[in-house]
Amino acid sequence: MSNKQFHLERKHNVELKSDIINNIDIQSLKRKITVPNESNYAAMEFVLHSTPSVVSAASTSSDVEGPTKNKQFRIDTTQFKQSSVQDGGSRAAEITNKILFMLTKDNMAFEAIEKEGFKLFIKSVAPLYKLPSRETIINLMEEKYKALSTIIKAELSSVEYLSLTTDIWEDRLNFRLYFGVTSHYIFNNQHKSVTIGVTELTERQSAKYFETWLLDVTNEWKIRKENIVVVVSNAGSHIQKAIKDAFGNDKYLACFGNSLNLIPSKVIELPVIKSISNKIRTIFTYFKRSTTAADKLKTSIDLKLIQYFSSQWISTYNMLQMFIDLSDVIKEILLQCRTAPTMITASELETVKESVNLLKPFLDAIKTISAEPYLMASKAIPVVNTLKTSLNALQPKTEIGSKMKKLLLEQFREGFNFIENEIILSISTVLDPRFKNIHFKNDLAYFKTIGNISRALYTRELHKRPIQNNSTSTNIKNDFWSYHRELVNTIKIQDTVHSNDNEMYYLVQPPIDINSCPIQFWNSDNTVLGKLGRKYLSAVATSFPGERIFSKPGRIILESRCRLSTQHLRQLFFLESLSSEDWQL
């Protein structure tokens, strides 16, 4: 056997039949073997070990194929892939870009790339990739900021309408205050929220200082004043004045979410509620410190007791709700432990239950507006109307419960009694095809809103509103918007509009489904009303999206990041607010 035959049988898994070598047509085979000097060898017939038959010279039209081994890469292809992963290659740049995205989006310290575990992980998935240093990552972050900020500036300069939200937050590690602003706009039929400015408050917090800074930020990001629909803030009077002086009195709006949060926050400060909450907190603390009590609780139910933070009413609510759910188990365990604190009385437990029932509508409302990436201004009035209806439907049985309900209604009237007179909120609600005018309770405020819309449309005719059937059921279900659906089903049209009135004819049409997209509704409308609808549906009512970025301690400024400059913080806030699509990943 020649060396070549030995090589073919050993390396290429074939048998050679030399008696029919000269009869084979190698072009008819599906599997070919290329040898170093093919001209020196005759065509040969191949028999695959896994194939029972011999492929003969007569099988020129046969489609018989044998199993193939994994194809080996060409040397030049392998070298190209290796070089792309190495420093300066396309694959290396892709990996670096994704690492930078991870560090900024997940609020990781830049030192993470120098940790032993991360280095081992990268070595296992990309052995030829060289991790950049911390200094290189910071430089790349600056370059990424320049590139992506240019793109966002182009978007902001091209959009018709946008909203701004502001927030002040504290860096507790370094005892510093920061002021930030976030832009909210619709681009390619998608809502976007981008942090465009962060500054350290090094000067006296005067209205003039904030006004100048806000104007500088909007100018830097190519935002025109006439394109700003609303500026939302939950800050003090000096911020309000700065916004009004910079953009106009009609464009300032107090944060709806913050106003809503203040109502239950004041109620839980009632002495009787605070006293019972402290007793429950003492019980929860005992279970955390006592191994015996904790083990007994664990054998009964696999849950951990949660305590509350005095500054957060939702935390108090969750603690009270958990205590109600576990009260029977907790009572039995406390009776078995000598050093256990005293269980609350039956009347106190009833007070806790009524407190939870009264606060639940507010929790549902907060969850509704917080679950979305942003809250349209058009939802504020419907949320208030639905929440008030839910609250009125509750009938407390105890004296303390009745007192709580009275206080909640008083605080509610104080905060939202004139919400329908807010021009931005009222126009946004009417122009939202899901709500229109069915949630208005103040006829004067409604007709004033129609007048504002009519003047914007250059029309003099005012149209009457649909009236509601007063027999609306007050059976409030678990769904927050169940009351809204009842209103939709019970409205009556008082007057009609002539069919050729294409613009105001919209008002007498039934509302669309609550889960429908109002922006898509107006996108296909090229009338003046459609343009007005797109304008006011771009408005937001709360600074919650900005607070998700600014107000959570430790999200951006970690102990390992506390030495970052204000410029780098501004870049981090901006990059964190962008999506993976914006990063072009």
Map each language-model feature to its residues.
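Generic recognition of stable, solvent-exposed alpha-helical segments in well-folded globular domains
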Residues: 94, 113, 117, 136, ...
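C-terminal recognition-helix end and immediately following basic linker
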Residues: 1-27
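Short, basic alpha-helical nucleic acid-contact segments in DNA-binding proteins
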Residues: 8-18, 33-36, 142-151, 155, ...
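Mobile genetic element proteins and their domesticated derivatives, centered on retroelements
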Residues: 4, 118, 133, 167, ...
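Amphipathic alpha-helical/coiled-coil segments positioned at domain termini
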Residues: 124-125, 177, 303-329, 347, ...
